[in-house]
């Protein structure tokens, strides 16, 4: 729902789900094994307590997934950045100049652009924020604009699906096969790096319109 299948591994969502499921499945049976005795006086209470513990673990796990869900897919000058809910502070969210970008997505990530400002001071502020671990431009909604307004510049950095200095033969085959699986000819597709704080993947875009066609779990 929040994570496209191709981005599950890149966003580490698969590990989180396995951890939550593993803990919940192990904790219940293990505790039951420890406390279970057929004629134990307080067995029902103990089993109910174990059930409650499992529910608490599950609830915390779901909250963690919710709080770390992807909320914005941001086109910065030369790539895409996937931004998670816990990476944008309420203060920065409130600074968004476009009203619909003041709310974190409840469903799939919202596609936006984030061009670098022309002001040298603002550029310096962004750089300082990035190097001090307080977030780069992709975590600053006040710079968000409609994706369509950034497409022309973004496509200048998009690359063809041919092998070359930027793409190994193996990865070229993976991307070309992915393009075909999405129903497109490789020659009509370009690719861009999709980065996040958790890993990397590749985003396929239409070579002319810049429309996003899909994501590929591949090393850019």
Task: Show where each model-derived region lies.
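Membrane-embedded alpha-helical segments of integral membrane proteins
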Residues: 1-35
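Intrinsically disordered, low-complexity segments enriched in polar/charged residues with Gly/Pro
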Residues: 5, 58-61, 188-192
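Short extracytoplasmic/periplasmic juxtamembrane "stem" segments immediately C-terminal to an N-terminal membrane anchor
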Residues: 16-17, 74-90
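Alpha-helical transmembrane segments of integral membrane proteins
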Residues: 18, 45-51
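Transmembrane alpha-helices and immediately adjacent membrane-cytoplasm interface residues
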Residues: 30-39, 49-77, 82
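Extracytosolic and intramembrane catalytic regions of membrane-associated proteins
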Residues: 91-220
